[in-house]
Amino acid sequence: MQKTKNTYKKSGVNINLADRFVKHIAKISKKNVQKKKKYLNKDNIGAFGSTFDISKIKIKDPLIVSSTDGVGTKIDLANKFNKFDTIGIDLVAMCVNDLIVQGAKPLFFLDYIAVGKIKFNNLKQILNGIIRGCNISDCSLIGGETAEMPGIYDKNKFDLAGFSVGVVSKKKMLHKKNVQNGDVVLAIPSSGIHSNGYSLIRSIIENKIITKKIKKELLAPTKIYVSEILNLTKNNLINSAAHITGGGLVDNLSRSVPEDLCLNLDLAKVKTNSIFKWIKSNNINDREMLKTFNCGVGFCLIAKRKNMNKIKKYFSKRYVPYEIGFISKDKNKKNIYNKIRW
């Protein structure tokens, strides 16, 4: 009896389907290349490495800023609800929102997608979200990797990682050393949960039937703050900033305040979203909520009080910043007052 020959496809890796996906990427990336043609090489797609002409960036004393991140176990809910069109936006947001904390303009983005089995339509939706996120951020998707890994991932499982690079003038860079006594702390609303705390959420909904409204809120894409923050830095309106991710409001804001000054926060001023009230109703205490979720605040600014009204003009009605605290000289590193009004 003749033995059947082993092939890569039989082991679970479909090169033909992977090539088809690469061709799809090349096709939909043409518009992006045309839009950014003075920076990008039209031959980036399919090359071993991607190029970006930084000599065309007219910034004095430029500093390169980089960030890499993922979307954590939010991907499991995308699988559970069979909805993949927003998770790519999350991936871009988690990277570029970190760049703008230092005032950097995102230049380009690369993605890494690992799957147990290539599912073309699902990957198309994920990629469309990534491109949408790049368009919102005004940065270029210049490369990436899609890895099919049977045996490492279940055939229905996948993971995402992103990498982004930005640039900022040395004089325009946001830094905690710019923060001064008397500065005001402003909260910018989040669009929802963003991309942190999903392991806890998954444990909450494991044996529950949830409504369509809750499903929609659980997968709402992370707000990208690039346009607003870059306008503020361009006009020298803010001193420091914080992206509110894992660790929550207090821990992330503390990273943006110098050691010799005190962060004063009034939690009663925080305007929380309905989804967080729903999460808390599942027997989660205040401390756990604050350490795990953004609780309605996706990004924070530290600025001179006199700049508050000017700052607000750069935001749409839904995302207008509001005061939640101030900076002072104090023996304490931080003073936290009151509780969030759920």
Model-predicted segments: where are they?
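N-terminal glycine-rich phosphate/pyrophosphate-binding loops that anchor nucleotide-derived ligands
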Residues: 2-100, 138-139, 150-151, 180, ...
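A glycine-rich phosphate/pyrophosphate-binding beta-strand-loop-alpha-helix module
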Residues: 80-159
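Glycine-/charge-enriched secondary-structure boundary and capping motifs
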Residues: 2-12, 21, 27, 122-137, ...
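General beta-strand structural signal in soluble alpha/beta enzymes
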Residues: 41-44, 64-67, 108-109, 140-145, ...
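Acidic, glycine-rich active-site loops and adjacent beta-strand->loop/helix elements
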Residues: 69-72, 112-118, 145-151, 166-168, ...
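Beta-strand segments within the central parallel beta-sheet cores of soluble alpha/beta enzyme folds
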Residues: 64, 107-114, 127, 142-145, ...
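Phosphate/diphosphate-binding glycine-rich loops and adjacent basic-rich segments that engage nucleotide
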Residues: 150, 154-209
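A generic local secondary-structure boundary/capping motif
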Residues: 39-40, 52-56, 97-98, 131, ...
